[in-house]
Amino acid sequence: MSETVEGPTVGEPAVAGSAVDEAAITRLVEHVVREFIDHSPANSLGGEIQEPAFCDPLVGYASGADSMFEELKEAVGPGHWTPAEAFAAGTGQQVPPEELTVISWVLASTPATKADNRKEDRFPAERWARNRIFGQQGNDELHRLLCQALSEAGVEAVAPSLLPQWQEKRDPDRFMVTSWSERHVAHVAGLGTFGLCDGLITPRGKAVRLGSIVAHAVLPPTPRPYQSHTEYCLFYSRGICGACVKRCPVGSVSTTGRDKLRCAMHLNPGTREYVEREYGFAGYGCGLCQTGVPCESRIPATRDGKSAAGGGAG
């Protein structure tokens, strides 16, 4: 995964001849993400709280031919797109998967947002609810900014989660299935593993929002520094913790699984009614299982200083 870096200067070509300049494209992507975080008015909690929604981004890359994308048809659902299917849905072009790269990113919630939500025990803090609604609107804008920047550099890209064909629907076995799961895509791109409450634990923790695009370019993939899809979770990897179980206000998280219906009912109508009544805007959210837990802001560490991934706490 990559810390965001300085990008190309204005007018600097991102392509060398007919071949994509991998380094220039990578710099461009990470520059656009950093510019969004530092300067975009879309990175905002909205309303009277004129603060950024996000900080500390990370970017990861995965080959469109990575076999794990096919495995997501089992893990998420048979309707989950491969990168080639997503690119075809957005462009009408049939492109070999090895010619595509999935670019995924992590946007960390701000310390103030996390601190506020840490204090709650039933409903979301206002900053958290604003992050969920207005922050996600900004994240959607980042998808568009990246696609536009790549297009101007001669690289076609699509944002699967913004395509009109994208669906989220009920499933008798999995409760809800989607055409493109940002959590699972980020996992493939080396950005994190899953926790007991199903959130993705990243180097920026679990109190994050995620996004991704599919680009018609071959970029170096990010190594996956884990062996299993739950490696960073202290409960799954060490048999300890379970803090998110205690944080869930409706008992939807347990050591034997997650009651997704109970969680969904708490979100809507439960938190929606609360947010509209108390904060005065149409929104919802919870995130209690993502805050006030060891994996809130990092890959968690045990008392002996060892991380769930097996190394030092960092």
Per-range role (PLM):
Residues 2-7, 11-132:
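Non-catalytic, usually N-terminal nucleic-acid engagement modules in DNA/RNA processing proteins
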Residues 120-314:
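Catalytic cores of enzyme domains
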